[in-house]
């Protein structure tokens, strides 16, 4: 298993089996990773199609663990099972320029508590250690919470709008 640890989170890289469970059976996925069952899954901005996309790509790229999906787990106490606070994804391996896109989503009750920053920081560090030269995030141009999270981790608004209402933020690897 590929697991990254932050101060409060364990980021579990999905392999094909876990990605397929997440796309096919929420209950089986929660049981497989031994977390509390969440009534709403996946969190925005992810949709079921994104879960199927990750499972499909991992089926064709079994060595791609880490590039297609991560489960974000927080331990809220010794007696309680871990909580699945959100998911994140690097949208495939880096392109020819070394760019890779990052997306993350947290369940509403976990937003505004620093989990997004921990996730983004850990995944950007992992991506750079594994060949990426720049991590890009696209977000709703009006989403000040996500923009604040990205800025705290060192991302900068590129001032590009790849689509109407969408802002592009980027973080480059240290030279």
Stretch-by-stretch model annotation:
Residues 114-117, 128:
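Glycine-rich acyl-CoA binding loop
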Residues 117, 144-147:
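Short, surface-exposed alpha-helical segments at coil->helix boundaries
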Residues 150:
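Conserved active-site tyrosine of GNAT-family acetyltransferases
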């Amino acid at each position: 298993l590929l697991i990254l640890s932050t101060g409060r989170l364990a980021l579990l890289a999905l392999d094909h089996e876990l990605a397929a469970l997440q796309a096919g059976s929420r209950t089986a996925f929660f049981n497989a990773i031994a977390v509390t069952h969440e009534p709403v899954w996946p969190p925005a901005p992810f949709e079921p199609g994104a879960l199927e996309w990750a499972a499909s790509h991992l089926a064709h790229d079994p060595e791609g663990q880490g590039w297609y999906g991560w489960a974000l787990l927080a331990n809220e106490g010794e007696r309680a099972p871990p909580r699945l606070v959100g998911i994140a994804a690097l949208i495939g391996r880096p392109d020819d320029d070394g760019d890779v896109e990052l997306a993350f989503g947290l369940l509403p009750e976990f937003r505004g508590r620093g989990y997004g920053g921990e996730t983004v920081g850990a995944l950007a560090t992992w991506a750079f250690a594994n060949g990426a030269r720049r991590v890009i995030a696209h977000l709703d141009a009006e989403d000040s919470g996500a923009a604040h999270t990205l800025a705290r981790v060192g991302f900068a608004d590129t001032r590009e709008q790849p689509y109407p209402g969408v802002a592009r933020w980027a973080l480059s690897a240290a030279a």
